[in-house]
Amino acid sequence: MFAEYGVLNYWTYLVGAIFIVLVPGPNTIFVLKNSVGRGMKGGYLAASGVFIGDAVLMFLAYAGVATLIKTTPVLFNIVRYLGAFYLLYLGAKILYATLKSKGSEVAHDEVPFGAIFKRALILSLTNPKAILFYVSFFVQFIDVNAPHAGLSFFILATTLEVVSFFYLSFLIISGAFVTQYIRTKKKLAKVGNSLIGLIFVGFAARLATLQS
């Protein structure tokens, strides 16, 4: 399928894309958190930020920026530390809001809906490893002798975005149902918020120690 457009082993790529999307990361956790805390609207706003951020990174990967980042340690480190700092900021903000809440009240990070989109977009764009991954993964399924490599890249990128959309939609819908349950489970909600905050701090530490 799509072999005439320079795509190699499309079905193998699709299976790989599914497994890649299923691996939990900061973007996934952020979408899930907002779907639980702010409902389906909050979840899809977060997902939209992730989709657009990923699309930008894929385009930059195709445009050759990934090679520049990989061969310029200073640039890589700047993006890496910005991403780590932002993850740490989000994690600390969640933990602070949770600890500040009184008794068994649930702490909600009641930011405007527009801010949810911006946070997700920044979270997606400040991950230098993502852009390097797109190049290393996509190149395995593109025929370098094909006349239109850009079209091949577009097909692979679109496929990954579609898979991501369905998976995040599943999380968002599930999160919306969970919201109804935790409204009567205040302590459970506080534990969940604390866990999410710690996960973001962990992602920050991991990103800060990654090498190009």
Curated annotation (Swiss-Prot):
Q: Which GO terms describe its biological process?
A: L-leucine transport
Molecular functions per Gene Ontology: antiporter activity; L-leucine transmembrane transporter activity
Family annotation (InterPro entries):
LeuE-type
Q: How does it sit in the membrane?
A: Multi-pass membrane protein
Task: State the Pfam families in the record.
Answer: LysE
Extract one GO cellular component term from the record: plasma membrane
Q: Which residues cross the membrane?
A: 12-32, 49-69, 72-92, 120-142, 153-173, 188-208
Keyword Cell inner membrane attached: yes
| Reactions listed under catalytic activity | L-leucine(in) + H(+)(out) = L-leucine(out) + H(+)(in)
Q: Report keywords, A-Z.
A: Amino-acid transport, Antiport, Cell inner membrane, Cell membrane, Membrane, Transmembrane, Transmembrane helix, Transport
The protein's location, in the record's own words, is:
Cell inner membrane
| Functional description taken from the UniProt entry | Exporter of leucine.
Q: Which NCBIfam families match?
A: PRK10958.1 (NF008201)
Q: Give the similarity note.
A: Belongs to the Rht family.
Q: Mind telling me what this protein is named?
A: Leucine efflux protein
Organism annotation: Citrobacter koseri (strain ATCC BAA-895 / CDC 4225-83 / SGSC4696)
Top-level taxonomy: Bacteria, Pseudomonadati, Pseudomonadota, Gammaproteobacteria, Enterobacterales
Gene it is expressed from:
leuE
